[in-house]
Regions:
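Active-site-adjacent substrate/metal-binding segments within catalytic domains
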Residues: 40-66, 70-79, 84-91, 97-100, ...
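Accessory beta-strand-rich segments of carbohydrate-active enzymes
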Residues: 4-5, 9-16, 27-36, 55-185
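A short, compositionally biased
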Residues: 5-10, 83, 211-214, 276-281, ...
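Short acidic/polar inter-strand loop motif in beta-rich domains
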Residues: 126-133, 287-292, 324
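Extended acidic/polar, glycine-enriched regions
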Residues: 112-118, 203-310
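Surface beta-strand/loop "capping" patches
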Residues: 179-210, 312-319
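Short strand-coil-strand connectors
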Residues: 14-16, 81, 92, 222-224, ...
Length: 353
């Protein structure tokens, strides 16, 4: 089964022929402040003196020490849980890929690029603001920065009525090595409704040369993997209880599907309308009698509908329904507790509770 081998620490940050220590998760501006190269952006108007940071390119580096234990795995993956935002990733000089979305996880298979001993992992960060300058926004308008809506990062980084203009920048979430079987479950997506139906969509990382139609149905393909593998599905209403429902299906390719019907499903309701029961699932990938990959999670039985009704010739009213019942929706805004997303900690959240 895949497992986390190690988190990657001991990063450095290089720019203008200078190299300083960097913290990951973290932020480039915060690293510069720790090194005494910029002022405290939270003091007075000093944030205006750091605007140059988001105009520069920076390079992160760290070392992956590959021993025989690591190299004995079929698959070794370097995982980035969050890079803000534009970057190119290299291992030993080989380009692994580019990032352009702060909110996505990026995964790169590196087993064939590793050699025993030290391997250099490099992340070349590209200026967010310079990239935005190239975006054509003719005909668009937005407050604070008309180009911000085209960049997949926290929009408050471009300034707001409650925050200064501090464009956070860097590796803001964990970086780690996963290793294990070459064949594994990439993702499980669950769609459930208020009738007790639950559909499980399972994506495997099999090497398949295939063509899919617009509905995602494979119309032709050739498989490099064995197709006598099995997927086992288990569903229960308690975290560690014996499965109430289970099913086994044959693997048919990269995308697989299974359905369950629960005649006595307990429905999920918003607070004030009922309870919020969650069901637990576990999906196992079996090969040659051994479980080689597992994914688990929780889901709820519910149906969410936005009902639109005419209110005249040109006006439409709308009503949100949960499980066919009209609900009144209200809420509030949460202002981030830090301008620099990468330095937010659980302790800072607890201090506010």
């Amino acid at each position: 089964r895949e497992k986390m081998y190690a988190k990657l620490n001991n990063w450095t940050l290089t720019f203008d022929n200078k190299t300083i220590s960097a913290q990951v998760p973290g932020d480039i501006t915060v690293d510069l402040y720790r090194a005494g190269l910029v002022k405290n952006p939270y003091f007075g108007l000093d944030y205006k003196d750091i605007e140059w940071v988001a105009r520069r390119d920076f390079t992160y580096r760290t070392t992956i020490c590959a021993d025989k234990e690591l190299l004995n795995n079929q698959s070794v993956t370097v995982v980035f849980d969050g890079i803000d935002v534009f970057a190119d990733v290299y291992l030993n000089g080989t380009h692994l890929g580019a990032t352009k979305n702060m909110f996505l996880q990026y995964r790169y298979e590196i087993r064939n690029l590793l050699h025993e001993g030290n391997n250099t992992l490099t992340v070349e960060m590209h200026s967010t603001l310079n990239a935005m300058d190239k975006i054509d926004t003719t005909g668009y308008y937005a407050i604070f920065n008309e180009k911000r809506m085209f960049v997949r990062k926290a929009q408050c980084h471009f300034g707001w009525d409650w925050a200064p203009k501090i464009c956070a920048y860097g590796i803001w979430n964990d970086v780690y090595i996963e290793c294990g079987s070459k064949q594994k479950i990439n993702d499980v997506y669950v769609v459930a409704d208020d009738k007790g139906n639950a559909a499980f969509f399972v994506e495997l990382n099999y090497n398949i040369n295939s063509t899919y139609d617009t509905l995602g149905v494979m119309v032709k393909g050739s498989y490099e993997e064995k197709l006598d593998d099995k997927l086992h599905f288990y569903v229960s209403d308690e975290p560690f209880a014996e499965a109430d429902t289970q099913k086994t299906v044959e693997v048919v390719g990269k995308k697989n599907f299974a359905c369950f019907v629960n005649q006595s499903a307990k429905l999920w309701w918003p607070v004030g309308y009922g309870e919020q029961p969650l069901y637990n699932y576990r999906v196992e990938l079996e090969r040659d009698g051994k479980i080689i990959s597992v994914k688990s999670g929780r889901f709820a039985y519910r149906t969410v509908s936005l009902v639109e009704e005419p209110k005249g010739d040109t006006l439409y009213g709308y009503q949100l329904q949960i499980n066919g019942v009209d609900v009144f929706v209200k809420g509030s805004n949460w202002i981030p507790i830090e301008c620099f997303t990468g330095v937010v900690t659980d302790d800072k959240y607890r201090r506010l509770t």
